[in-house]
Amino acid sequence: MASFYAMTVPEFLAELGLSGRDLFDLEWRLSDGEGALIVARTGLTVEAIQAMTFQEFTPDARMMITRKDGHHCPLCPDDVHRKSLASPWVFRCPVHGADLQDATGATLPEMLGDARMAALATHAKAGSVILDAWARGAGQGILGAPEMLAVLTARHRRASPPSLAEQPRMSLQTRRDYHEFLTMPILRQALTVVVPEYDLVAPVLAKPVRPGLYGLAQGSLLQGFALTVGIGRLVEDPVALAIAVLLASDTDGQGRVQDALRSWPLSLRRRISARLWRAKRDERDRRIAQTPTRRRQSHEYRRVQSHEYRSRIS
């Protein structure tokens, strides 16, 4: 609104009689008195003013509101910050239909590839619906967004340096120069098991995400998309994916994942425990079947002596 009146934000707030008020507090919720001041100076209705705020978001979801320096539409004016683009689970501009860009100007299709992006679209849409319902306090089904994010961001394996597949091609001298980078431990999280496509394209140093809700609220465009896809997949088959994460975990990682799963409903945890036991049993049987068996050596004494063989042959 400030740009519409050709004013800076501080000038506009002073004109409204709201000088000194925090801008983000006003965008979050307006009191009746603050709304009346804006209505008196702009001529808009109270309903129109309240529709510009995030009053429908729950307090826990306030941290999800992205600021001006977040992801942006390349076709929207620089001085326009749309409310519809302020959620980290929105990846296309609803006005222009363009893919959002990150701080470097890259889009998700450029980072993931068109084919991979199309394959992930269904789960990304399902995850966006779940997150939007959670932010507005609506029903979310059996699992809530915070519970799923806790599992996705759990460290399922100990930190380890980049593997050969994660390292770029470089000469021997370059490897010596970047020895510190090649030996730097990287956090390993369940997100890479649930969304292996993210593990393939994410820069190795930028793979780790912040724990829980902070991973979505403060993550990059690619990280937010991967977490949204992960939520869409967990909603579809939570038991199978939880087992996949546990089987891919090391001993300490299994404990951390189990801690994150404690917030899940008891019925789901019982199904996970039962199927995990069967999966471990089947894996153990498969390994035993693949192990080559040695020919058993007999320890019985020979009843025929060697000299008898020689006599018979002669």
Residue ranges and their predicted role:
Residues 1-314:
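Basic, alpha-helical nucleic-acid-binding regions used in initiation and control of genome expression
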